[in-house]
Amino acid sequence: MSITLFTRTDFRGDRSTITSDTPSLAALEVGAHPSSAQIAAPTGAALFFRREHFEGNALYRRGPRNIADIGKAAEGGKATWGNTIASVRVSPFQLQLNVSVVSEEDGTLPGGFTSGQDARERVAAVVALANTLLGNQQALITLDVSRFNVRQNDRKFDVNMPRLAAYPPAWKEPGFVDVVVCNQARRKGQAGVTKPPCLGQVLLLAARLRFENPLSGNEQTVNLADDLMAVTLVHELGHYCGIHHPSGRGGATNIMNPATAEFDPFNGTFAGPALADLELDEEQIGDMHSSLAGARERDRR
């Protein structure tokens, strides 16, 4: 993959070509003020940051792509950006997950988890699927289960008010994404809850879902399968990184559109679009990375 930067708009003027992560453009011929860019690779993506060392707001674009004017959305760039790009990233950032699976004090585990080892393996499978979804989108984000604990707590096994829930300090790890897997949220239809940057640190996933059967009208519960939990994890990661439901623009395959997360009420599997068709658009991914370079900057590696 190669990216060619130009000092002037419309691919004119002096140029510099980069093929790897470049934490500072200052030493290149174009310096830190390129005005246009070309991403030559048929696959691959790039993050253009306004500050050195991959800091500041991020502009994300997939290849192949011609950006005739970095400061104009209509020309492939972003309004208000001008020619202020100071660093470029082409390899993924890693987010380390600190996972707490909540059991009752008698040892009962969430959802269909049968043992601590089974919970560990299921979480690993969910994260692997989430990484596939992110990889399909060339999101330049990978997830790693770096900490895993089963924690006994009757009060956190089923979460009554997920948006107001607080968790013990011992469950949190600075520099990690704190993920809590509970049994279920009391609110029907809720498979996960996460607050945006500056409002919360915990990404909550449920292993079991309460819902109203549309045929009988009766309330039911179902254990969630790995694929539905993975879609929920990526959706909640979006919230964690500051993007919200409207960012999906109602797209039938957009991961941030709540209507996309359809499920089979009999086995808890994902019943929405094919996993390979689920998407995050360029602006959503760019906004996620802007949060990871800002309010969530301690979480990325």
Regions picked out by a protein language model, each given a short descriptive name:
Residues 214-301:
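The catalytic-center signature of Zn2+-dependent metalloproteases
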Residues 47, 97-101, 143-144, 178-181, ...:
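Structural recognition of the beta-strand scaffold that forms the well-ordered cores
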Residues 28-32, 72-75, 128, 132-141, ...:
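Structural alpha-beta junctions
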Residues 14, 91-93, 165-248, 262:
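Active-site-proximal segment of zinc-dependent metalloprotease catalytic domains
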Residues 12-16, 105-114, 187-190, 263-273:
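Short, solvent-exposed loop/turn elements at domain surfaces
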Residues 10, 52-53, 101-103, 147, ...:
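A mature extracytoplasmic/lumenal domain signature
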